Amino acid sequence: MMKASRSDTFMLRTWIQLLVLFVIMFIMSAILPIAASVEGLGFPCYFPNLVDYSLLNLTLRNAAKHLTPTLFLEAPELFVYITWSVLVDLASAIYYVVGALAILQARKTHLTSMITLQTWINLVGSHTMLFIGIARMWTLQLFIHVLSYKHVMLAAFIYFLHFCLSYMHTLSLVSRNSPKWSVLLMEQHIPKQSLLSTILDYGKPLCVNMYLSLLALEMLVFSLGFMMAIGNSFYILVSDTVLASINLYFVLTTFWYMMTEMFLQDYLKLQFGFYLGVFSGSLILLLPVLRYEAVFVSANLHKTVAVNIAMIPAMCVIAMMFRLFRYSQQVRKPENSYTPLPKRFKKRRQKQDQQLIMVETSDEEL
C-alpha cells in the first residue's frame, strides 16, 4: 500500500473544510425560514405574503405604481417548497458526511495509488460541487431576506442566480463533470464491499433523485418569479404574464426531459425524481385556478389556463413512460465494463497510429 502524497492530504483537508462550511450553511438555511416567520426578529413582513391575491384581475394592465398581483406561490405552497428544499439539503449534508467518513475509512485500508484519493472525492462530490452547493443555499437565504422586504425585481434576480446554481449543482451531481468513459475508470478504484461503495451505490442515487425533484419545483418558482418581475416592469396584461409563466415552466421541463434521454441517462439510469417534482409543480399551479376560479372565469381564461397547465403533467407522463421503457431495455441488456470512445477520439488515435507507422517505416529504410 502506498501512502498518500502531501498534495492528496492537502486536497482531502480542504475538501473536509468545505464540507464543514456546507453543514454550517445548511444549519443557517434551516433556521432562517423559521426566524423569518416570527415577528420581532428583524424581518419587516412575512415573506410568503407578497400581495393580496384576492385583488387579482386578469383583464388589467400593470399600473407601475404598486405591486400588481400575478400568478405566484402563496404562503402554503411557498412553505412546502422551502420545507422540501431544507429536507433535500439535509439529506445532502448527511450524504456528504457519511461519504467523508467512508473516504477516511477506505484511506486507511484500501489506498493503492496516489490518485485514488482524488478519484474517491470526485465520485462522492468534488470541491466544485460543494462550493456550488454552499452558494445555492446562500442565495436561497438572500431570496427569503429580499422577499420579506417585498422587493420583487431584486428577488427575481437573486432567484435567477439561485436557479442557475441549482441547475449546475444537479447537473454536476449526475454527470460528475466527466465523460462516461472517465467515470467508469474512476469507479474501478472503489473498494468492493466497503462503506464507500455502499454510499455511492445507494446513497448518491437517492440524493440525486431528491435534488431532481427539487429542481423541478425550482423551475416552477423561477418561471413564476421571472414573469412576475416582467409583469410589474412593463405595461402588459396580467393574463399574459400568467400564461407566459405556465408556458415557460413547460419549456424548461421539456428541455430537461430531452437532456435526460440524450445525455444524463448514460450516468444514472434510475432518475425519476424530476418527474415526481413536475407532478407536484403541476398541482401547485392548479391551486390558484381552483382558488380563484371566479377570476379566471370572468376573464374568459379558465379553459385556456387549464389546458396550458394540463399540458405539463401530460408531457411528464409521456416522458416518464419513455424513461421506464428505456430503463427496462437497459436492465435486460448486459452492461459493458467499458464505454466506446467518441468518434473524435478514434480519429485522433488513428492519426497517431498512422504517424507512428510512417516513422517506423522511415527508420527501417534508413
Curated annotation (Swiss-Prot):
According to its UniProt record, where is this protein located?
A: Virion membrane; Host Golgi apparatus, Host trans-Golgi network; Host endosome membrane; Host nucleus inner membrane
What Pfam families does the entry give? Herpes_glycop (PF01528)
What membrane topology is annotated for this entry? Multi-pass membrane protein
Task: Give TM segment ranges.
Answer: 18-38, 84-104, 114-134, 154-174, 210-230, 236-256, 270-290, 305-325
List the ranges whose topology is Intravirion: 1-17, 105-113, 175-209, 257-269, 326-366
Per the record, ranges on the Virion surface side are 39-83, 135-153, 231-235, 291-304
Print the keywords alphabetically. Disulfide bond, Glycoprotein, Host endosome, Host Golgi apparatus, Host membrane, Host nucleus, Membrane, Transmembrane, Transmembrane helix, Viral envelope protein, Virion
InterPro entries listed in its UniProt record = Herpes_glycop_M (IPR000785)
Specify whether Transmembrane is a keyword of the entry: yes
Q: Which residues form the signal peptide?
A: none
Q: Which GO terms describe its cellular component?
A: host cell endosome membrane; host cell Golgi apparatus; host cell nuclear inner membrane; membrane; viral envelope; virion membrane
Q: Briefly, what is this protein's role?
A: Envelope glycoprotein important for virion assembly and egress. Plays a role in the correct incorporation of gH-gL into virion membrane. Directs the glycoprotein N (gN) to the host trans-Golgi network.
Which family is annotated? Belongs to the herpesviridae glycoprotein M family.
Instruction: State the oligomer form and interacting partners.
Output: Interacts (via N-terminus) with gN (via N-terminus). The gM-gN heterodimer forms the gCII complex.
User: Which protein are we looking at?
Assistant: Envelope glycoprotein M
What organism is this sequence from? Saimiriine herpesvirus 2 (strain 11) (SaHV-2)
